[in-house]
């Protein structure tokens, strides 16, 4: 079981106490907040990228792949509803290095997407998830 306690800090600000730290949540001044924290929907995209990124990093280590830089760019499109939800999410895995093994890196991404990342499985229940990979030789 996971447990997170989220406490109101006044106005539109909250703090979530997680097992490994605290996350501040707020909205921008244009929405009545102070802009002093993360926005909830952006945190969802960050959780998705972080979950899959941990899988891919672990697999890169196990496969002994040489990667100089690795980042994940995640974009989500929201519905127009009052309670807007993501209906489409694109995740772009970007690898840079001198000796990139593209097939093995794509395998690591696919294993995360199809087998290991629980956050990915949650997103797939409510959004179309598109996966892209990019490789940059340096």
Regions found by a protein language model. Name each.
Residues 1-46, 57-138:
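Extended beta-strand/beta-hairpin segments
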């Amino acid at each position: 079981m996971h447990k997170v306690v989220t406490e109101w800090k006044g106005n539109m600000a909250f703090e979530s106490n997680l097992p490994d730290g605290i996350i501040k949540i707020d909205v921008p001044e244009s929405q009545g907040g102070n802009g002093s924290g993360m926005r909830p929907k952006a945190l969802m995209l960050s959780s998705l990228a972080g979950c899959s990124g941990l899988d891919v990093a672990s697999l890169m280590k196990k496969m002994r792949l040489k990667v100089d830089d690795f980042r994940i760019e995640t974009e989500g499109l929201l519905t127009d509803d009052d309670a807007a939800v993501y209906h489409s999410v694109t995740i772009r895995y970007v690898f840079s290095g001198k000796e990139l093994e593209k097939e093995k890196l794509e395998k690591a991404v696919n294993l995360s997407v199809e087998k290991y990342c629980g956050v990915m499985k949650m997103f797939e229940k409510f959004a179309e998830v598109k996966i892209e990979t990019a490789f940059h030789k340096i």
